[in-house]
Amino acid sequence: MKPLHLKLNNFGPFLKEEIDFSKIDNNELFLISGKTGSGKTMIFDAMTYALFGKASTEQREENDLRSHFADGKQPMSVTFEFQLNHRIYKVHRQGPYIKEGNTTKTNAKFDVFEMVDGKYEIRESKVISGTQFIIELLGVNADQFRQLFILPQGEFKRFLISNSREKQGILRTLFDSEKFEAIREILKEELKKEKAQIENRYQQIDLLWQEIESFDDDKIKGLLELATQQIDKLIENIPLLQARSKEILAFVNESKETAIKEYEIIEKKTLENNILKDNINQLNKNKIDFVQLKEQQPEIDEIEAKLKLLQDITNLLNYIENREKIETKIANSKKDISKTNNKILNLDCDKRNIDKEKKMLEENGDLIESKTSFIDKTRVLFNDINKYQQSYLNIECLITEGEQLGDELNNLIKGLEKVEDSIGNNESDYEKIIELNNAITNINNEINIIKENEKAKAELDKLLGSKQELENQINEETTIMKNLEIKLDHYDKSKLDLNDKESFISEIKSAVKIGDQCPICGNEIQDLGHHIDFDSIAKRQNEIKEIEANIHAIKSNIAVHNSEIKFVNEKISNINIKTQSDFSLEVLNKRLLENENALNNQRDLNKFIEQMKEEKDNLTLQIHNKQLRLNKNESELKLCRDLITEFETLSKYNNITNFEVDYKKYVQDVNQHQELSKEIEDKLMQLSQRKLIEQNNLNHYENQLETYNNDLELNEQSIEMEMSRLNLTDDNDINEIIAWRGEQEELEQKRDTYKKRYHEFEMEIARLESLTKDKELLDSDKLKDEYEQKKEKMNTLIDEYSAVHYQCQNNINKTQSIVSHINYLNQELKDQQEIFQLAEIVSGKNNKNLTLENFVLIYYLDQIIAQANLRLATMSDNRYQLIRREAVSHGLSGLEIDVFDLHSNKSRHISSLSGGETFQSSLALALGLSEIVQQQSGGISLESIFIDEGFGTLDQETLETALDTLLNLKSTGRMVGIISHVSELKNRIPLVLEVKSDQYQSSTRFKRN
């Protein structure tokens, strides 16, 4: 991420300010300088706030960022443009505030844009979703951004000196290690659940074991006394328990089957004795009833004689009944013939009346024919009547319009002739304008080249003078530095390392005496006198330091001058003096004026000719349009006259209205005549059809009557023959027999019932005699008592068996459940063993006493320290290295950092470092942290980094080393910005973003030293 442009409104001390970072060339190292409180850090706050809605330091709240001098009606807002992965984005964030005069807060706003084809297109327009979009785009949140892109005032030192708990919070945020702690909690909960499930499984096994039925059997009771925790023993005892339960069930089942067989025997004997008793009683009763039935035999014989006579007279009765039906049909046929004749007479009368109407209608036929002919001839006129009507209406208007168009056309022709006379033989000359323009352009180019060359020569002279001055300064400073180095070489440097050991030597002298062994060299002490002049050593050491400081300052100045000479050389190489014309500026300006005047004159002439041509074209177009309109008028006038002639010729009318009235009247008369004619024809056709139908009906009825008369004659002959056969002389004999017909059904039923019962008695008596033959009837009471005893015994044993069988099956189900629980428990213990071990390891119960999260954080910290030591070695002249404190870890320990001193070959606490050494270590650690986070995050693009304060604690040499480190960052393609009050940095860093304050508001500007 590389800043391009920052715009602040009412933000901190900036009421309305813009910072253009595009002025920083080639990721140049630059300094942000200004007085305390001027708002240098606020620039970092603005970037962080624009992206995440937070300041660059955790202590500053959003409400603290708004300017106290802001207009109460204006919001606080930041607009930040930046480049990421060769794509340009812009964010605009407006903070929430209470507008002056309102009581409710105006909500925050946030918009994210991306540049596409040179224009910004919106990507998000909501605060929450927009901030999330930025987090996903950059690949970091606000806390990670502070550690990677912006190292705020005092923030990057905090990570170096913090304890394990504080480092854990920082590293947890940067590397998202909370997920490992979440894994530990999940495993802990899973372990708790598994233990609860296992305990519940043991309880279920114990409950099932206690519920097993013992049947009051000593062997089963002995098996059930086993403790349920001994699941292996339970598995061994379950088959024994099931086998003993089956033995008990088999014994009860054998007793039950014996009782059932005894019950079935007595039940069968009792049933057979009861059936025999019922059969004997039934046989005696049937014999008595059969004797009584036989007494009805004479009456049945008389009934059969009557039924025979009724059967013989049936044919005669059918013939008599048929005669009555035929006589009824003959009477009905005669009635139908009479009705049909009357209908035919009425139809003939109706036809005569309609014939009269038809004759009257035909008398008007000639008149209707003439009207029909008129309609056919003028139908085409009537269908297009509006066209002819419009012709009568338009003809006068068209005549007037034609005369007017003729006058206008003549006027336009006269105007065209006048314009053509004005143009004459003149023509536009655009090639001459092009030639004059080219000449003017060439003259201007020659004038510009002369002016640019004069300016370039002046700039070149100035740069060469500056370069010569810088080279002279370098030569002078080089001479001074060589003299100082010669002077430094002549100093006596012996015993200088004893300068700060005076107190140490005094302590040793006070602790030893002459003749003792020296604790330093091991030799015998000969003298305790003063052999070292510490004042002289200190004086020489101060003089040497002063010379070294002067040499270092001169080297720094030479480096600055070399950098400035390089910058001047780049500017000189960019100066280009072009080849110019031999003419003077005065001659060129005169030629330029002449060509410009000629150009203006030609343009005016061309403009006049074009205007005349345009007017000519316009008049020509108007004449053409007028001619078209005149032609159209003449065509329409001719059409109107032709239509009027056509109408009057065909219709013989000269009035449209009269024609329409007569035409419609004729159409109405013809339609009425045609409808009436059709109606009469339809009526005649209907009458003819109806008469034909009635004539057919009459023929049918007459044929029926003849058929019925023949049937009646044949039926009479059959009646006479039957009466002769039955010896019947008259109708009285027949009527007497017919009277019996009302009782025939009753007589037949009585006869059939008698015969049926007679046969049933014979069959039943024979059956019962066969069932009771040779059989002895036993004592019923005695049999009943024995039956009840056997039944009660059987039911008792069946209930006992059912209970034992249910309990045995229940025992089997419970033992199967116990086996299933035990198998599941064994498998569960086997499967969860790895989870138990993993949960203990993750929770810190391992050989290092480290939780999973702390183990991961230690890994990342080691990576960060290794990366930081690469720079710290350079900055500390290979003296210091950061190391992680190797202590027995537990919980949150293991993240403390110590420093290893290669001079003493010992590690010591980080707080023992001086202020400058602490800054070196903090900077190296912060840069290492930044690079490791970038490696782990993958998508993060670190194209810039900003550092706030910390350089004031460094001496000259250390400052140079720190700057070299930051310059190395610049060479890797990263923009590096520094906030500092150190004046030396202003001389070392040529580009400065200066922040000025007038106690009311602040402003910024880029300047070069």
Curated annotation (Swiss-Prot):
Keywords assigned by UniProt, alphabetized: ATP-binding, Coiled coil, DNA recombination, DNA replication, Endonuclease, Exonuclease, Hydrolase, Nuclease, Nucleotide-binding
**Is Metal-binding included in the keywords of this UniProt record?**
no
Which ranges of the sequence are coiled-coil? 176-364, 401-501, 535-805
- Pfam families attached to this UniProt entry: AAA_23, SbcC_Walker_B
A single GO molecular function term of this UniProt record: endonuclease activity
Listed binding positions for ATP are G34, K35, T36, G37, S38, G39, K40, T41
Domain of life here?
A: Bacteria
| Biological processes per GO annotation | DNA recombination; DNA replication; double-strand break repair
Entry-linked InterPro entries: P-loop_NTPase, Rad50/SbcC_AAA, SbcCD_Nuclease_C
Family from the record = Belongs to the SMC family. SbcC subfamily.
Under the subunit heading, UniProt states: Heterodimer of SbcC and SbcD.
Q: Which NCBIfam families match?
A: sbcc_Staph
Q: What is this protein called?
A: Nuclease SbcCD subunit C
Q: Which organism is it from?
A: Staphylococcus aureus (strain JH9)
* Gene this protein is translated from: sbcC
